[in-house]
């Protein structure tokens, strides 16, 4: 102790004698947690090389024998100078296009041979402040890790920027810029210009501008990369099933000789105008739904991540949560004042912060919506919150923390990488879930309504004389000036008017805990090869159980109920259209809003969709809440509320749907092509708007009520549960229901679907940007009944995808993400499609068509190249091998184990069938199904653009 004091004293004397030394005597923290009282999770290993590059390593075996590798460069579009707009993103593209040791075009091939699919396992992204390179390793082989690290080092310090490679990639980047244009981007740009006129970031969208991208030279891009890609701005992350010591040694061996360089300073970021007030803006577009945003700005506050700042942040979170919950209650009334509303305060990089009140309304409903939302906001800040409201929010927070702590040991690689990314970008310390729960419990008693209100008042910027922005299809008044005055007058009136909006919270308890006498078991067998237990209850309900230890305390629930889209007929094609709205109508004894309060703090949810030959219900829950989850889903099937609140929300949603029907090329295509290729079959055709406005919960009840009451049910549980306890829970819920049909109906007549006899060109028009087009080829194939053919077409899809990507993207530079797809139906007899798609410039339609037709014809003309075949097959092998390393994979395999047992056998033989396929097999499939004259060729063109004759 005395020695420590002496050392400190000597240090002080040295500092006093050398006044210029302090800056060098105390180095800046390397990691955010070094200036926090929060301890990082000790399972993470943090390090820094002498050159300044940082790294984070963590051993983790979820999923087993896999890993995630990330390279983050602290450089984004905010680091660009005026002549460099889009350069950070352009450089990201060039990382895949040639380096010292990997020639142009070889990086993706190298990874594909190793089993990494381009896009799914190999990707990158650029934001305002960062560039992130991502590799998902399907195996934990040291050689594969070495390859990943080698490629990351190539990206960091060895890119070549060959002029011809830059020129080829320029077309790809420009196509990505083109594809992103449209009403949504223009609306976003207008909002940024209004709210932040003096800020730099509004002119630094990562995609850049056409002018700067066209002007980018090899030398200019290389100069940007050399300036920004330096060790001090770089962090490497490796999380997965590798020995941490071995990973650290590999990182040092690969990156230690990267020369250190001084990082460039980021240019000035402009300003947020704290005194900006009293202005209004109106932005109109036929595709925009109505929204009013009320805003005020304030100064940015430096708040390091500490235990105290998290406590204060939690208080703020609770306050905003209560206000937004009040608004949610109003949005669920039979005649709501708005579709949705919310309030929050967020940072604007490091130059300011903004409080926004956002109100979404039906067309021409802005006045009532703005008035109501303003009153909710006023009342909260003036009068505070009730104990019950705060308790409801606390319950949700507590449960989230408890669930995280329970599942801590089996967090996925992706989740752990996400925690590291938060540390790097937001300086949020990656603490253990257990410590987060402990801190919450320590502070829980202090989370009072008064404390919540005080924290909220200190954080939210007063919305006095605010900025008001309107977006929508119809102006709020006859001209801009009158519209601005109307918006301001409504806001001011809402601030003066007496507070009169009251929505009471429910009382009582969840009413669906008794479904009758528990069901008896008619049969109970276990497949030893899968550890899959299969039970049939006496009432006909079937239960599949697969217990795993892959995700601690997590249980996935899936229910298939007979019916689905097969209830849609040519005479009644929208019979199941509103199915997904069923939970919005609540239950017979509880509204949806009541359920949210009654079940606060419980890990349960409900959803239902009409999918293929069944209605599908799904949820994720915990061991503790498994029975409640089953009760909730059983109640949704046996006693849905059918409330008219769901009608109102659905009709508003469909109004917006039709406003955007052809607003972009992709929406025009997706809403038109199914009808085209199905010969105008009403079941696959968008009906007139009035058809959807006539749909109601009452009509849905008439159309699907019988299936809910009597249809066959298959229930599957996958995850961490006690099997016998789970069987008893199922017996008390689904097993206790009245007798169901024992089997799923065959629906033979309803399964008929015919591909249009009209082949060749069809033109679809869109109302988007004048230079945007889509080229899509669709060939009819077959259904999914033959596993060998299905596997062959899937492999052919991968081969064609590589070929099309190489030609349309890499060689021609015409499209950002050309794609192929083989889709074989398990529902419609004989129905399947093989699709090639590319989003291109209108001027490039003809060249793209030629490239696609030539590529597909080549697949039929000759056996595929052996290297391309290997690159296509390897990622498929990895997907098969890794399927059962997650609960989601087990669920996909077992969810129809009783009604479609052939799926299990197909899985066991999948790898063998894949490996047996030859180049000649694929050539035969291409000849059989991909004949040039058998395709429907859909061209999606702007309105008014000339179309080819054929």
Put a short name on every predicted segment.
Residues 56-58, 63-82, 86-88, 105-154, ...:
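M16 family metallopeptidases and their MPP-like homologs
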Residues 8-18:
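Bacterial N-terminal signal peptides
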Residues 1-5:
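N-terminal secretory signal peptides that target proteins for export/translocation
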Residues 23-57, 237, 243-314, 319-328, ...:
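Proteolytic maturation boundary segments
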Residues 212-252, 692-731:
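Internal metal/ion-chelating core segments
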Residues 157, 165, 170-220, 224-233, ...:
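Hydrophobic, small-residue-rich alpha-helical packing segments that form membrane-like cores
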Residues 94-102:
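Metal-associated gating/positioning segment near the N- to mid-region
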């Amino acid at each position: 102790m005395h020695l420590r004091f002496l050392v400190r004293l000597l240090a002080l004397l040295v500092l006093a004698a050398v006044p210029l030394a302090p800056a060098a005597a105390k180095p800046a923290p390397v990691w955010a947690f070094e200036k926090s009282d929060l301890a990082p999770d000790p399972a993470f290993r943090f390090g820094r090389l002498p050159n300044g590059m940082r790294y984070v390593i963590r051993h983790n075996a979820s999923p087993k024998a896999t890993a995630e590798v990330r390279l983050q460069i602290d450089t984004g579009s905010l680091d660009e100078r005026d002549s460099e707009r889009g350069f950070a993103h352009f450089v990201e593209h060039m990382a895949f296009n040639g380096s010292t040791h990997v020639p142009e075009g070889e990086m993706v091939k190298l990874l594909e041979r190793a089993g990494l699919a381009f896009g799914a396992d190999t990707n990158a992204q650029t934001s305002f402040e960062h560039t992130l390179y991502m590799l998902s390793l399907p195996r934990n082989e040291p050689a594969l890790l070495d390859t990943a690290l080698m490629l990351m080092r190539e990206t960091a310090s060895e890119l070549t920027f060959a002029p011809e490679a830059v020129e080829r990639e320029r077309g790809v980047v420009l196509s990505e810029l083109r594809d992103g244009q449209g009403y949504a981007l223009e609306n976003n740009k207008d909002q940024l210009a209004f709210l932040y006129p003096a800020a730099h970031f509004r002119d630094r969208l990562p995609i850049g501008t056409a002018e700067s991208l066209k002007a980018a030279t090899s030398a200019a891009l290389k100069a940007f990369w050399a300036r920004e890609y330096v060790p001090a701005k770089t962090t490497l992350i490796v999380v997965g099933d590798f020995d941490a010591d071995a990973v650290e040694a590999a990182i040092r061996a690969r990156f230690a000789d990267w020369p250190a360089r001084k990082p460039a300073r980021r240019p000035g970021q402009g300003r947020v105008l704290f005194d900006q007030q009293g202005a209004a803006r109106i932005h109109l577009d036929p595709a925009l739904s109505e929204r009013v945003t009320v805003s005020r700005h304030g100064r940015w506050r430096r708040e390091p991540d500490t235990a105290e700042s998290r406590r204060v942040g939690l208080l703020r979170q609770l306050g905003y949560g209560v206000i937004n919950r009040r608004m949610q209650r109003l949005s669920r009334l039979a005649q709501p004042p708005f579709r949705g509303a919310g309030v929050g305060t967020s940072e604007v990089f490091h130059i300011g912060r903004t409080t926004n009140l956002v109100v979404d309304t039906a067309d021409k409903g802005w006045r009532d919506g703005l008035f109501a939302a303003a009153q909710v906001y006023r009342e909260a800040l003036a009068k505070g919150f009730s104990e019950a409201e705060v308790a409801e929010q606390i319950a949700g927070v507590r449960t989230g923390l408890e669930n995280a702590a329970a599942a801590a040991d089996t967090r996925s690689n992706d989740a752990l990488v996400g925690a590291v990314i938060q540390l790097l970008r937001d300086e949020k310390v990656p603490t253990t879930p257990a410590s987060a729960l402990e801190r919450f419990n320590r502070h829980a008693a202090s989370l009072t309504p008064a404390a919540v209100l005080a924290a909220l008042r200190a954080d939210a910027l007063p919305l006095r004389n605010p900025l008001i922005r309107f977006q929508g299809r119809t102006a709020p008044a006859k001209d801009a000036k009158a519209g601005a005055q109307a918006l301001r007058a409504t806001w001011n009136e809402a601030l003066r008017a007496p507070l009169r909006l009251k929505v009471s919270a429910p009382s009582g308890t969840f009413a669906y805990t008794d479904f009758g006498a528990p069901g008896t078991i008619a049969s109970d067998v276990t497949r030893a090869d899968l550890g899959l237990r299969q039970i049939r209850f006496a009432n006909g309900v079937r239960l599949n159980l697969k217990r795993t230890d892959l995700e601690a305390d997590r249980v996935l629930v899936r229910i298939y109920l007979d019916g689905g889209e097969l209830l849609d007929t040519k005479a009644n094609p929208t019979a199941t259209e509103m199915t997904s709205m069923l939970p919005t109508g609540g239950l017979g004894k509880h509204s949806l809003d009541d359920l949210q309060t009654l079940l606060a703090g419980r890990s349960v949810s409900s959803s239902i969709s009409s999918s293929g030959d069944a209605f599908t219900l799904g949820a994720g829950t915990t061991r503790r809440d498994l029975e409640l989850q089953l009760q909730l889903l059983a109640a949704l099937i046996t006693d849905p509320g059918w409330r008219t609140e769901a009608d109102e929300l659905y009709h508003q949603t469909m109004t917006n749907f039709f406003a955007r029907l052809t607003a972009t090329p992709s929406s025009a295509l997706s809403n038109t092509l199914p009808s085209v290729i199905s010969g105008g079959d009403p079941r696959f055709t968008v009906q007139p708007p009035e058809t959807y406005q006539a749909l109601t919960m009452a009509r849905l009840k008439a159309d699907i009520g019988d299936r809910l009451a009597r249809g066959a049910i298959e229930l599957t549980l996958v995850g961490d549960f006690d099997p016998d306890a789970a069987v008893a829970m199922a017996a008390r819920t689904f097993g206790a229901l009245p007798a169901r049909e024992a089997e799923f109906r065959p629906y033979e007549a309803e399964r008929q679907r015919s591909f249009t006899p009209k082949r060749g060109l069809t033109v679809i028009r869109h109302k988007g940007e004048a230079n945007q087009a889509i080229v899509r080829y669709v060939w009819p194939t077959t259904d999914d009944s033959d596993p060998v053919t299905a596997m062959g077409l899937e492999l052919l899809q991968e081969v064609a995808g590589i070929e099309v990507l190489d030609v349309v993207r890499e060689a021609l530079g015409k499209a950002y993400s050309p794609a192929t797809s083989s889709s074989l139906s398990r529902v419609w007899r004989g129905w399947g499609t093989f699709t090639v798609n590319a989003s291109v410039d209108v001027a490039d339609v003809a060249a793209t068509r030629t490239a696609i037709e030539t590529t597909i014809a080549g697949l039929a003309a000759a056996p595929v190249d052996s290297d391309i075949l290997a690159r296509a097959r390897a990622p498929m092998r990895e997907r098969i091998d890794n399927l059962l390393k997650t609960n989601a994979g087990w669920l996909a395999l077992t969810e129809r184990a009783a009604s479609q047992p052939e799926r299990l056998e197909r899985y066991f033989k999948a790898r063998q069938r894949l490996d047996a396929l030859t180049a000649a097999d694929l050539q035969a499939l291409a000849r059989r199904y991909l004949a040039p004259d058998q395709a429907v060729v859909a061209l999606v063109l702007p309105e008014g653009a000339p179309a080819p004759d054929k």
